[in-house]
Amino acid sequence: MSSRLAGKLIFVTAAAQGMGRASVIALAREGARIIATDIRDDLLQSLRDEVIAAGGAAPEIHRLDVTEPGAIESMIGSLPPLDVLFNCAGFVHQGTILQASDDDWDFSFAINVRSMVRSIRAALPGMISRRTGSIINMASVCSSIKGLPNRAVYGTTKAAVLGLTKSIAADYVSSGIRCNAICPGTVDTPSLHQRMAQLGDIEEARRMFTARQPMGRLAGADEIVPIVVYLASDESSFATGQWFNIDGGITI
């Protein structure tokens, strides 16, 4: 355990699995105080235990549905000003535009975009009052950076996340607030496993996802975590309005 993030209060959405879970463990190991939230409250307790076992301070855990109006605002409003907001919640819709209903679009925008708008809007006043804060948005290389097949809804929402990131950075740079986005390639997470299962043949799906990665393999969640820690730390104090591609060469 080090002290790179000692004393920092960090709020994380979608903390129970995948990249969110790995990030909470790493952030806590660096000395941060974590507010870990997820709709899967059954997994949050095991996360708490894992953080403690890894040498970090026990995170404060809360069930949170980021699509519920007022829920994010109420939770963040009950806390002291945040040092770091990590928006990790997301949903991947599979299919073309002709395979996506209005409900599909609404649901994806609610999770992938509107939840970030709400959390940022709730966190900003406290950050501005202290003239410091780092906002980290989970985006994707599948966005305005690169088009991928069968990702019409997802790519559109993640392009919106990049636009939101740039806008927040531009509006609040003079207030001491930084806002950046992380754009992973294909990461081996429970979310990916669900998408593989939806395709029917899991092994063929894994081969398909792996084939689009020039490195010939999927990323592990632990390979995304270092950039999360960097953006949460004061080491990134001169970085804002940027997106960081951690994609195994997919955007070369």
Model segments located where?
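C-terminal substrate-recognition "lid" of short-chain dehydrogenase/reductases
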Residues: 4, 117, 217-246, 251
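Substrate-binding pocket helix/loop in short-chain dehydrogenase/reductase
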Residues: 96-97, 104-109, 209
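Active-site helix of classical SDR
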Residues: 120, 157, 165
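Alpha-helical segment proximal to the catalytic Tyr-Lys
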Residues: 125, 170-171, 237
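Residue(s) in the substrate-gating loop at a strand-loop-helix junction
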Residues: 140
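Short, small/polar-rich loop/turn modules that mediate ligand/substrate recognition or access, typified
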Residues: 173, 178, 239-241
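Short, flexible catalytic-loop segment of classical short-chain dehydrogenase/reductase
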Residues: 184-194
